[in-house]
């Protein structure tokens, strides 16, 4: 249990969608890291002044670090191929909401999510790698502001916080995250900067989870955890809640009672995004609490690989993870 107060930037927006909209049975959640998604105009503006290191959160810039891949230059055909996946999320998967990572705000997201979506609740960050949401049109929601405490050093990413069906019996709170990269396996207490930053972020997420449990409302945490949670959950968090040595048992510790989480990818074989995907384990995931799980005992997992015909296009190094939840 963490008692630390979390300060979220209050949203100036109220309800979006129709407060009287009737939810369908269940809820379908998805998450997608879109690999430096920005408009062509923004890319062209930033490319001549790219930086030799990763920009800070307050800098609208991207890196051109020697020896490392640069943000992709996308054509309209690339955006169209990505939009095909967004259409699959809307039509085939019936996704209600998609947590987005590495997207430079609503204008960039609209290049891909161009029909049937509201693009909102993006974090207040200058850096092009923003976290936000694509919400199915007509679904009522409220932006709760940034979980700014996740930016632990001025260069890591805040969380995006949204409530679906606010004020109704179907209310669900969601936190979208893109945690520090580089510490995919092993203990967090190593003298390695990515692990040190991730270890600082862990109690921020736990405090958010604990607050939701005390409120008694269903919730989920979804996004790019940059961590192989299947391995992580096998090991204890350690005695210090403010500095855990692993993530899952820190977050899912039943303290306070009810702080127990289920993972979308648990027991699921890794599905590659395309022919060049040589990963063996997921780092994108969806975690739901006991209330959401008990109300939706039928759960359908999907991973949307890209169309083989689009192999070689500038798409993303991630593809969507989907979890359909029904009673």
Language-model segments: residues:
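Structured beta-strand-rich core segments of catalytic domains in phosphoester-bond hydrolases
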Residues: 97-180
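Metal-dependent phosphoester-hydrolase catalytic domains
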Residues: 13-21, 207-220, 226-327
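Stable alpha-helical elements in mature extracytoplasmic
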Residues: 78-85, 94, 105-108, 130, ...
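Second-shell loop/turn segments in exported
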Residues: 18-19, 67-76, 88-89, 93-100, ...
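Metal-dependent phosphoester/phosphodiester hydrolase catalytic core
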Residues: 43, 167-200
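Active-site beta-strand/loop signature of hydrolases that rely on acidic residues for catalysis
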Residues: 29-34, 66-78, 85-109, 174, ...
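N-terminal, active-site-proximal structural segment of metallo-dependent hydrolase catalytic domains
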Residues: 12-115, 126
